[in-house]
């Protein structure tokens, strides 16, 4: 049992010895229904978490200040803000200072990672973050499946731990619609 995705693909659940386990849905930069102008905005991140999604965020550290933003740091936050949401965040460190900061100050409770187009990246929580379109592995995170998923590769996604998408609402709705 799973979710039908463009062309009738089975998606978003996998069988286990204890029944169907839904895939975790991670909002990419706080997006809900496609890329938007409020990406990485703290209020948008909170909205995503309150809506039941995990959230991938982009973190910069400049002059000991924590900032969210994709191409550059825009929105100031602090370590308490991250810790208050640590169970729902996937933190993409955008510069070496952010990576060093989290590695030294967080006791590995906040899940974080670094990559720049790498095919595979291991997060601090030992999940394999897979570049869009690359081969998936059991327990990995499929990034932006809306860009590459087709009927030929649909079975691969069932092995994943999670998907990270700009369309979490769509995937959630499809999952709910296909549940018994």
What spans do the regions from the language model cover?
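Intrinsic disorder/low-complexity segments
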Residues: 6-8
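Phosphate-group recognition and catalysis centered on beta-loop-alpha active-site segments
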Residues: 11-12, 18-180
